[in-house]
Amino acid sequence: MNDIIKVTNVSKAYGGVKANVDISFKVKKGSITGLIGPNGCGKTTLFNSIVGYHPIDGGSIEFDGKEISHLRVGDIARLGMLRTFQQTKIYTKMNCVDNMQISVSHRRNSKNGIFASRKGEIRERAEDLLEFVGLYSKRNLISGDLSFGQQKLLEFAMALMNEPKVLLLDEPTAGINPTLINGLIDRLGRANQELGITLCVIEHNMRVIMNLASHIYCLS
């Protein structure tokens, strides 16, 4: 497998605080890669650097063979790399289907991009993906009324609407009750195997990451 993400000697500091120092790692195309380490070691900062939320101070970041460290979030998203967050970023006053439909913004010209111009097809895809993550029965509910775990599943489905090549997930099981964790593990695995999405996952739950990832990096 080729490397779809290649991080080389990346450093990032906030004033006098060094969040990342000479970090290097690779993510193989089609893999699930884990990123572990204690709180405060710079995992989330590294994710933010990769997707363009802030400039890096040194090093390089390549995505699918292209240097992206100079690009902004929207440009990187349009190339096919998205991320989710520890705290969900959903529209809590809207129902689940509307959340899904409004999320279609980054990759209008994807291989299945024709659906993006057809409202009925967008809704059909939204409902299919809600079924994929186990939220079809909740599709018309206001998303703010969902449990936190269900909101994380919704955010995951919203990312899938944009057909990413790579999805970075920041602690996807944090705050989720144990009964939902197994279902989330299953759906992440299916997204990788059935949809061909490369996953890079920050996770503190070692059972989860050992079950999911084929490669694991540790930041100290």
Predicted regions and their residues:
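The feature captures the beta-strand-to-loop junction immediately N-terminal to the Walker
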Residues: 36-38
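Helix-to-loop junction immediately C-terminal to a conserved catalytic motif
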Residues: 51
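Conserved ABC transporter NBD signature motif
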Residues: 59-66, 79
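Conserved ABC ATPase "signature" region
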Residues: 113-138, 179, 186-189, 198
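Conserved catalytic motifs of ABC-family nucleotide-binding domains
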Residues: 163
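Catalytic Walker B motif of ABC-type/P-loop ATPase nucleotide-binding domains
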Residues: 167-171
